[in-house]
Amino acid sequence: LGRVDHQDAYLDYDNQERERGITIYSKEAHFHWKDSEIYLIDTPGHVDFSSEMERSLQVLDLAILLINGQDGIQSHTSTIWKCLKHYKIPTLIFINKMDISYKTQEELMNDLKTHFSSNCINFKSEDAEDELSMLNEDIMNHYLETEEIDSSLLQQAIFKRECFPVFFGSALKIQGIEDLMDAIIDLSFIQDYPEDFGARVYKISSDDQGNRLTHVKITGGVLNAKDKVGTDEKVDQIRLYNGKQFEMVQTAYPGMICALKGLNKYEVGQGLGFESDLSLIHI
């Protein structure tokens, strides 16, 4: 298990990150959990690197807002929350370091409901089902008829930002992590992607050989290695990164986060295919 204070966190491999013990650059990873494939972007939480975090928001299907249980909601936490609202990103909340926090779950939930939304709900509490049943009329009617929360209606409510599931635990002690991972799978709204090709650029980087990499999320259709993008550029390689390591694939499908080698003209926020360009809000 990698630890920031041991300078061996899997995604914080940059020398500056290991020296300072914080995330500076957004990183990608992908993995399987219970027959589902998850594409993860780990972003900085420090206020000095807000722009790096914001660039990643535009390609997220779901955000996990990580809050230190010792500190609770800080001013920068509220800023990130406003960004998530601006980009209309469905959000789960994980309260970390509960093994050493002097605050109770009830105290932290009161803070979340006061500062963020009354629809922040502790999914492991005894009152969770009652709170969920009152999210909207459709969920309530189904609950009154069946005494169960309809999973598809709940997914839609989370997708529409009508509900913000909250989980508590400790990453270091591996407490609450399985509940969070299950929630990512069970509560995510499955999107339908168009058949036409589209992608969104969220990051530009260079590899160890100095090759320019254009990091994108595929939002429709498929992209093959050697395909032309735009009028005069060709994708030489499609890379799937896991931290510092990567594998090359022949085809990228909708929902994938990948890095494209061979493109030199695209910048952060630009769209490929049917996607239009976006402007960032610059927090």
Question: What are the language-model segments listed below?
Answer:
Residues 2-25, 118-123, 150, 186-197, ...:
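Active-site phosphate-binding and catalytic loops of NTP-dependent enzymes
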Residues 13-14, 27, 50-53, 76-81, ...:
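Short beta-alpha junctions and helix-cap segments that line functional grooves
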Residues 1-59, 63-67, 73, 116, ...:
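P-loop NTPase switch module centered on the Walker A-proximal segment
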Residues 41, 67, 169, 216-219, ...:
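Surface-exposed loop and edge beta-strand positions of immunoglobulin-like domains
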Residues 281-283:
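Conserved small/polar residues in nucleotide/adenosyl-binding loops
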Residues 69-208, 227-229, 258:
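P-loop NTPase catalytic nucleotide-binding module
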Residues 187-188, 194-279:
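Conserved nucleotide-binding/hydrolysis modules and their immediate coupling elements
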Residues 21, 42, 56, 64, ...:
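Residue-level signature of catalytic and energy-coupling elements of molecular machines
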